[in-house]
Design a protein with these regions (language model features):
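Juxtamembrane transmembrane-helix boundary motif
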Residues: 1-23, 32-44, 67-142, 159-161, ...
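Hydrophobic transmembrane alpha-helices of multi-pass small-molecule transporters
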Residues: 39, 58-62, 85, 112, ...
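Transmembrane alpha-helices of multi-pass small-molecule transport proteins
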Residues: 43-64, 177-178
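Hydrophobic alpha-helical transmembrane segments of multi-pass integral membrane proteins
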Residues: 167-187
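Conserved small/polar residues in nucleotide/adenosyl-binding loops
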Residues: 189-196
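Transmembrane helix boundary and interhelical junction motifs in multipass membrane proteins
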Residues: 24-33, 146-155
């Protein structure tokens, strides 16, 4: 990877935006970080650079919310997210970068539309649904592995449960901490070895 002016114009702002978003100040601006980095590097390399930042920030966040989470919800969504991650790791090389971005974009649009069209009264919490939790968390694991963008399907399942704010935030943090740790060996699996890199040259 060549480090030049384009690298600093695209990668450095992308990492800064990701840091701001993880601090809670930037909302969903982190969604543009990975696409911005792919201007100058392959997608899997961009994912590998972002992942340690995610894990480091997770450590701090988990410590803060270590007593505020819904264990019952996590028991459902973490295993299915792991399944989605494994599927993503085995199919990752078969998708082009543009196709992956398109898939995640379409999923985000559909999930957002579903939430706003079918949401119930804010005072009525939805019941935990095994099938919905399994589907949403599996897709969250897949999209999180492919482009670090699993927030939308996760929110689609968690928000209707109307948890207390601290419990919702803590559950979400613990969930993505587990997801990021599971992604680490899977991302190493999909990364080209030094021998492959030399042969590619």
């Amino acid at each position: 990877m060549e480090i030049n002016l384009l690298f600093f114009v695209s990668v450095v702002p992308a990492i800064v935006l990701y840091g701001i978003a993880k601090s809670g100040l930037g909302g969903s601006i982190s969604l543009i970080s990975v696409p911005l980095m792919t201007v100058v590097m392959p997608l899997n390399q961009a994912l590998a650079i972002i992942l340690p930042i995610l894990i480091f920030s997770d450590i701090i966040a988990v410590y803060r919310f270590r007593r505020e989470f819904d264990f019952g919800t996590l028991k459902l969504i973490v295993p299915f997210a792991a399944i989605g991650i494994i599927i993503g790791s085995f199919t990752f090389t078969y998708f082009s970068e543009d196709l992956l971005k398109l898939i995640v974009g379409i999923m985000g649009f559909l999930f957002s539309g579903h939430y706003f069209l079918f949401k119930k009264e804010k005072t009525i919490p939805a019941k935990k649904n095994f099938f919905k939790g399994a589907i949403c968390s599996s897709i969250a694991g897949f999209s999180s592995f492919c482009v670090h963008a699993g927030g939308t399907p996760t929110s689609l399942y968690l928000l209707p449960l109307r948890m207390k704010k601290e419990i919702y935030v803590g559950t979400r943090i613990i969930f993505f901490s587990c997801v990021n740790l599971i992604k680490l060996p899977c991302l190493l699996y999909t990364s080209p070895s030094p021998r492959d890199k030399r042969q590619a040259r």
